[in-house]
Amino acid sequence: MTVSSDTTAEISLGWSIQDWIDFHKSSSSQASLRLLESLLDSQNVAPVDNAWISLISKENLLHQFQILKSRENKETLPLYGVPIAVKDNIDVRGLPTTAACPSFAYEPSKDSKVVELLRNAGAIIVGKTNLDQFATGLVGTRSPYGKTPCAFSKEHVSGGSSAGSASVVARGIVPIALGTDTAGSGRVPAALNNLIGLKPTKGVFSCQGVVPACKSLDCVSIFALNLSDAERCFRIMCQPDPDNDEYSRPYVSNPLKKFSSNVTIAIPKNIPWYGETKNPVLFSNAVENLSRTGANVIEIDFEPLLELARCLYEGTWVAERYQAIQSFLDSKPPKESLDPTVISIIEGAKKYSAVDCFSFEYKRQGILQKVRRLLESVDVLCVPTCPLNPTMQQVADEPVLVNSRQGTWTNFVNLADLAALAVPAGFRDDGLPNGITLIGKKFTDYALLELANRYFQNIFPNGSRTYGTFTSSSVKPANDQLVGPDYDPSTSIKLAVVGAHLKGLPLHWQLEKVNATYLCTTKTSKAYQLFALPKNGPVLKPGLRRVQDSNGSQIELEVYSVPKELFGAFISMVPEPLGIGSVELESGEWIKSFICEESGYKAKGTVDITKYGGFRAYFEMLKKKESQKKKLFDTVLIANRGEIAVRIIKTLKKLGIRSVAVYSDPDKYSQHVTDADVSVPLHGTTAAQTYLDMNKIIDAAKQTNAQAIIPGYGFLSENADFSDACTSAGITFVGPSGDIIRGLGLKHSARQIAQKAGVPLVPGSLLITSVEEAKKVAAELEYPVMVKSTAGGGGIGLQKVDSEEDIEHIFETVKHQGETFFGDAGVFLERFIENARHVEVQLMGDGFGKAIALGERDCSLQRRNQKVIEETPAPNLPEKTRLALRKAAESLGSLLNYKCAGTVEFIYDEKKDEFYFLEVNTRLQVEHPITEMVTGLDLVEWMIRIAANDAPDFDSTKVEVNGVSMEARLYAENPLKNFRPSPGLLVDVKFPDWARVDTWVKKGTNISPEYDPTLAKIIVHGKDRDDAISKLNQALEETKVYGCITNIDYLKSIITSDFFAKAKVSTNILNSYQYEPTAIEITLPGAHTSIQDYPGRVGYWRIGVPPSGPMDAYSFRLANRIVGNDYRTPAIEVTLTGPSIVFHCETVIAITGGTALCTLDGQEIPQHKPVEVKRGSTLSIGKLTSGCRAYLGIRGGIDVPKYLGSYSTFTLGNVGGYNGRVLKLGDVLFLPSNEENKSVECLPQNIPQSLIPQISETKEWRIGVTCGPHGSPDFFKPESIEEFFSEKWKVHYNSNRFGVRLIGPKPKWARSNGGEGGMHPSNTHDYVYSLGAINFTGDEPVIITCDGPSLGGFVCQAVVPEAELWKVGQVKPGDSIQFVPLSYESSRSLKESQDVAIKSLDGTKLRRLDSVSILPSFETPILAQMEKVNELSPKVVYRQAGDRYVLVEYGDNEMNFNISYRIECLISLVKKNKTIGIVEMSQGVRSVLIEFDGYKVTQKELLKVLVAYETEIQFDENWKITSNIIRLPMAFEDSKTLACVQRYQETIRSSAPWLPNNVDFIANVNGISRNEVYDMLYSARFMVLGLGDVFLGSPCAVPLDPRHRFLGSKYNPSRTYTERGAVGIGGMYMCIYAANSPGGYQLVGRTIPIWDKLCLAASSEVPWLMNPFDQVEFYPVSEEDLDKMTEDCDNGVYKVNIEKSVFDHQEYLRWINANKDSITAFQEGQLGERAEEFAKLIQNANSELKESVTVKPDEEEDFPEGAEIVYSEYSGRFWKSIASVGDVIEAGQGLLIIEAMKAEMIISAPKSGKIIKICHGNGDMVDSGDIVAVIETLA
């Protein structure tokens, strides 16, 4: 629907809400505004329309429209651009509220809640409507603003009190208007104007901002032309508001949607019509049509309700009307402004006392009891809305009587807490309408609407219902369509669950995962049976089976609503033999439910549980039965760690046994420690000091009263002496006896035992003592043979010998290994079985001669004799052989009276179908879970029971193997480096939640090098082997572990191999397996090589998290585009000198950016072109000869985790990229597999030469900048700005990703100091910088780059726009820059041309900086300004801050909490409105930086919106805001804090006023003692004003008490290193350093970390601890205690003391006023002489600084021939050497550290050799290219 430019408001008359929305969606914003203006103009004409009291101005309309237009989601808003009228007793900001009394009028400071909700939904408020004064009346004639007539007759009343609202809707001026309804005012006008009148359940609409009539009864009501519009507004306004409305209440969840088809409707027996004859006809017809809907219409005596109605005006509820305006009446308002009838009614309240009030309330409660009984069997009441259609004259003649009669059927509704809906009943023969009211119990609003729709279909068939005055038009069927409450079947699927998904049962989480909504508990029809299927995992499964009715029962189930888009995800979690089908409910409805395959019901072990009536009852029976079982042990100690300890604890918890964990120092925070009921430290690091120390373990058991010790696997699990020691200590060892372990532990004796048990043996020998004997035996056995240590294990002490020439060497080696590792030099020989398989049988023995085999496992896939992947049942194994294996194992166990779990291992010769005894593991195996998966047993539980002599009856136990299970072992090891262990901190961990994963690791786990590298066992269960392989593959694809290198890629490679698919496995197959990793390997790291992505980490600048990303985004994006990647794909940034990289897979690369010699396998390759790389090739990127950075794009990208939405590396924060750091020698980076690679977008392509960036060969650059945010004349003198652009700036040596420092002319300041912001004219209150801002830190400019700080207190003269920032990424120290001014428009044009050119690869689209783009002169950065209105609405200055930022600055240069709150209001408004184009709002002390998307909103458009928003912000000084009070421990002047100061003194500046001690400096300049500084720190409460004051959520906070705001200064120059957690004071501000970072605050102590990088703490949803308006307090702790707290924080177990609170500004001001004398005295003491002395001190210090720069002179020196000269790749300060003269070092080893600005950079040795010279000492300045060391290369 569109309109032409000359269309008037007449075309919109009678439009519904949807008509208005359709118009706006199909029209331009100009057309939309014109139509709204036309509507407004049409109402601003003579004669005055009595329906309106006030209309908005054109300016107000434009303001509302501007705000609406700014909203990103405006077209989805339910009231998008819909004009709405509001009754004039409801507050609308911008219009007076009169309540129809001119002398009562006031200007509301904010909207009422309902108006706020309507505006939020997109509505445009056009005016306020007339009413009976103070909403007292049902006639619409009691107003000094005139009488509002009925829309159909000027002689008849419109009804009151909401007369005006009904009139403007009936005439179609607006589709919706708000009324209020205390006693019928929302219904009577609806009846008299042919409208819908919705009077909601009392309290579900907020009455905040509504002038009360009777506050306890008032409701806001809705007038609408159709049901759909009424329901739409109901849904919008139905929001609880308990903070502002005492009677507010939330709507019920899952409310009644519709009444039944035979709903019982009661009508009055006797209806007084007061002589009216026409309305009874309408009512009778309406009732008849209600009956036709199928309703059961009955007559009842309404007397209890009518009695209740009489209370309203005959009782003390009149007093409520008086209370509402008492203060107004006491002010003696002009009598002519008061309606005499209204005032006489209200003043009638004076006759009632407080006693009367209680009397009438008691009376009401008594009547309500009658009402409840009356309505017990009634669903709905139907009454005439009003009996009369009075004329104006009739009302004038009998004003009270007529009004009273009109309220006959309305007055009782709110008193009885009922919902009501007034609907039309048609027209009388005189053309006047009337209606009926449907009344339901509270919260039946939706059902009443649906009933009305049914009624309309009967009384107005075939769409014949008219609306309002539009009697020639009918309501479109769509406009009476209803949505109903939020549960919508069209977007969800009903699902019945019957088993473990029920509430409180183990799989209920799966429903929660898919956002299912509980609907009800019900039963099936009587046609079902319920079965418990055999348990083959930890969860019991049900089987619901439909049968003949005669054999079936009703089964209890729960019904849920599952969103359609997540239903597939839910189905994927359903294991076989279950599936999803349909079930018939007892109501006859068929819905989705679980079904079971026939095999499930027939499987052995299936139990018919129908008699229990439901799964829950059966489950409870099992629990009860379980609890009655024999108590096993009270306490069991787990003598192990890692995943097996975690797994054992689960079973102990299930059995109700108290668990005890033991732990080493590195395992202090491990999962088994936190999972156990009790944890005991073993005090040590190595295995020998802890888990292998028998005495410590047994002492821990005694200490905790453990009756048993279960050892798991490894460590002491097969130590016979430990088993004996436990027994001697009176503690049960959960395992076999020491004698059995000893006998089976030595391989030669194990062979003898096996032989005795009749178990086949591999041909072999007894123990051999000499080489000669070994040679003889080997010859007899025939080569190849295995030489084995009798005590070996874990792959140690066994080696294959192929020929006699090797036997001597290997014999001695194995003998030595046995003696070294196991204390036993015994060796024997066995024949080697070629292509043997490793098959083992899981054995359980009861200790009394009975043993049972629980199945076999194939564990043939091994690397370095360690198992990798196991499966059960063993594939390709004849059934006869399988049974023989099990029988042999049982025979061995019975012979030994074996007790508990053991594994009998066999070598299986598949070719000959023969098996031989290998050994017995006298413990639980790592791979035991796969046996559990196919048998449904809990092997640990069996072990515990057997150890307690409560073994199952093996004779009657029938073990059934169901399906196939596989396990893959996830190790922290590097498969590319011969499976070298790979310890590290895990930064991200994800496992599939549908598979079984036995693990001990999670995000934040530190993998120690001390122990086994096992991270997890990933276990799946399938119906057959193919299914299991498929599931294991899926599980491995979904497994993500970052922070250390794992074997996940290796595992995926194996299970997708052809040999694994065919089960062609053997113990040696992996030895020859050609693993082809999808990875690259760093063999030389380069100077500063990191992973970045574009656009980086967006949206966290306000927190102090920089975007990072590429310094040269243009070249970076080209690299990805050339190889065909999506622009967001991570790639590699190279700085100064590039890396060498080995590619272990084929791929395509491109190198862009600066020029360097690039070679592939020694052959030079071109840049800016796609290059194919073969597997095994080595790429080398040399030193950059032009530019500073190059970029390596790899097709498909690099597999690294996202951090805060980005792959980019931020090294200072140690986040993102590869483990949060630059790449190092030996790093292995995996590339995404093809299955998961979503980064590839198109084929690789060459790019035209014209797209290659023009990197300066002359070291001279021209860079465009936008002016501002700070300029002339307020900050800089005009000539200083001119000089900035006319002079050339040299790039300082101290430049990097944190910032590019410049050397050039000293600025000429327009002011002498920064006022409250600081002593230097460059200082200002902390605000958030723009990325690319040229920031004057004192007199020295620094360009803020992608890793730079966000919040700071220095002015910025210009900003490098986004399109020009790539040049900043390419400048090198010593280069010169000429800045030129650009307009916003030119900057955007350059940026947009780059985007188009890169996307299209069309060089003609690219615009470069040229004379046309450049402004002739600099421009003012001030874009707009709003003058001060009052103290709470200060001056606002909008400053240009680049091409994507606007800085909004409030008030004068002073810190003011009211300004901070105003900024918060603006941020909240933007967030609420989802304002188009705004990316982020970053709060400073008195400003907010707004980042915007130039593609969505222009700078000018944004300014209009921001100016409009300012007028929306209204508050007084009594504001409140949510505020956490955060209490932190702090160690005063701890050693680490003092070390930072010392390091600064040694390396940066040897003398300064704040040296050698910062606390002394603060005390001296403030004339106080050190103790007073100490007292201030621990007594002050600091208010957080902004975040990111030196990165990562570091707060900029100010003491609430002005007496705690000391004089002070920051370091100059700043520190390059500050300890994480350091607390600093800088003048009035306090900061906590969130990371090891640069800084300038005076350091006073240290607290716990405030940046939870991995969100490990239970309360951490985000990494940052604080938000603006939080309050911080410190309490003293020792340094030792703080270190422990810090360690706890780093491991997520420290709980920060946080108190949820509200900051009450009014209370704060009261406190300030109460202490004003001492505050004033303190502030005056800081002025005058002290301030002058302080300023002079700092001035002198700065002067001294300029004279103290030290650069070590060059020295001429000859070095030996062949010496390797090491040059610095960086400019900076020499911090320290990490190797010494005389050391022999390897290539790549670190030599020394250069510190520059915000980073430490290691210079490594280019070659191996001996260091003969280190050329600098600590603190020396070093330039890029300087010689820093000399190495003598060794032959």
Curated annotation (Swiss-Prot):
- Source organism superkingdom: Eukaryota
Keyword annotations of the record: ATP-binding, Biotin, Hydrolase, Ligase, Multifunctional enzyme, Nucleotide-binding, Phosphoprotein
Q: Which CDD domains match?
A: biotinyl_domain
Which residue positions does N6-biotinyllysine occur at? 1798
Q: What does this protein do?
A: Hydrolysis of urea to ammonia and CO(2).
Report if keyword Calcium is assigned: no
Q: Where along the chain is ATP bound?
A: 122-129, 747, 830, 865
**Mind telling me which PANTHER family this protein's record contains?**
CARBOXYLASE:PYRUVATE/ACETYL-COA/PROPIONYL-COA CARBOXYLASE, UREA AMIDOLYASE
- Write out the pathway annotation from the protein's UniProt entry: Nitrogen metabolism; urea degradation; CO(2) and NH(3) from urea (allophanate route): step 1/2; Nitrogen metabolism; urea degradation; CO(2) and NH(3) from urea (allophanate route): step 2/2
User: Anything else the record notes?
Assistant: Present with 952 molecules/cell in log phase SD medium.
Question: What does the record give as EC number?
Answer: 6.3.4.6, 3.5.1.54
Q: Coiled-coil ranges per the record? A: none
Q: What induces it?
A: By allophanate or its non-metabolized analog oxalurate. Repressed in the presence of readily used nitrogen sources.
Name of the protein in its database record: Urea amidolyase
What positions does the domain Biotinyl-binding occupy? 1754-1832
Known partners and oligomeric status: Monomer.
Locate the ATP-grasp domain: which residues? 751-948
Q: Name one GO molecular function term.
A: urea carboxylase activity
User: Per the record, what is one GO cellular component?
Assistant: cytoplasm
- Provide the positions where the record notes the PTM Phosphoserine: 803
Q: Does the keyword Nucleotide-binding apply?
A: yes
